[in-house]
A protein has these predicted regions:
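Amphipathic alpha-helical substructures
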Residues: 1-36, 155-177
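Generic structural signal for short, flexible, solvent-exposed coil/loop and linker residues
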Residues: 2-3, 11-13, 17, 48-53, ...
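Beta-strand-rich binding/interaction modules
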Residues: 6-7, 19-110, 230
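Long, ordered, helix-rich scaffold segments
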Residues: 7, 101-260
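Generic detector of ordered, mature protein regions
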Residues: 12-13, 23-27, 35, 48-52, ...
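Flexible loop/turn segments at secondary-structure boundaries
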Residues: 18-21, 45-47, 139-141, 153-155
């Protein structure tokens, strides 16, 4: 094909069972301004096959600066395609290395637009997640980042003896506020980002689960966010009143209901 990619390996998606996991680590050399991603792929054994072959996995990527801006970079090692603005890394071995030329240490925005049905294992710090939640130009990753922070905060509240306001970082409140005010973001996506995970989803984190403690943790977080973001929610509720029940206004109604 035009990109000279051997797609035979891609057929493994149809013949090899199991969901691959990408274990990703990174490093940055400030002297050479080189950023490196080390990616290992592993597909767990299934009854019909113990050892799985390496898949061809497209991993869409962006790099985010500490101030939240999208970084420009050049890929200097590793296979890729670049259909539009984002690089799509081609992971085709058990271990792949990708090197980039970029002027500062970035936060990677990985698996943009859910470019492949895989599990990404990358050790994000909460600071990195909040940066992505507030600033990532990719709405899927923005949502994924803030959902992860919600789960971390609720886990801390669940484990604590008392509800602690400091367990809800101000940066989380700021990230949600930025999102709610972002008119470039679809209203339905803003509604999703401002919505905490469900009880059923959160309960999967704890075995066994203390139903009362988990309910208290969820309610505390929601109340804390409601109090801190009262002005934002009120402004959204007033702004997104809709008179017609058509498809184009569905996102606005969802955002209004979230604010309510």
């Amino acid at each position: 094909d035009a990109n000279k990619i051997n797609l035979d390996q891609f057929l493994l998606w149809y013949s090899q069972a199991g969901t691959p996991t990408l274990k990703i680590s990174d490093s940055y050399n400030a002297a050479t301004q080189e950023y490196q991603l080390n990616i290992e792929q592993h597909t767990p054994a299934t009854p019909d096959m113990a050892n799985k072959a390496a898949m061809l996995i497209p991993l869409e990527l962006g790099l985010i600066a500490t101030d939240g801006k999208e970084l420009e970079f050049d890929l200097i090692e590793g296979e890729f395609v670049k259909p539009e603005t984002n690089y799509v890394l081609l992971i085709n071995q058990t271990q792949n290395i990708f090197k980039f030329k970029v002027n500062q240490q970035p936060t990677p925005s990985l698996l943009r637009n859910f470019s492949a049905p895989v599990i990404v294992d990358y050790p994000y710090t909460q600071t990195q997640l909040l940066n992505l939640a507030a600033n990532d130009s990719n709405s899927f990753n923005r949502w994924e980042a803030i959902q992860t922070v919600y789960k971390q905060v609720i886990a801390r509240l669940y484990a604590s003896a008392d509800e602690q306001a400091e367990y809800v970082p101000n940066e989380l409140i700021a990230a949600i506020s930025v999102t709610l005010r972002d008119e470039n973001l679809d209203p339905s996506m803003r509604s999703l980002i401002a919505t905490t995970p469900s009880f059923a989803e959160l309960a999967l984190q704890f075995k066994p689960v203390n139903v009362v403690k988990l309910s208290q943790a969820i309610n505390y977080l929601r109340q804390r966010l409601s109090d801190a973001l009262e002005d934002d929610f009120l402004a959204l509720y007033q702004h997104h009143q809709t008179k017609h029940y058509d498809f184009n206004d569905a996102g606005k109604r969802a955002l209004k209901n979230t604010a309510l």
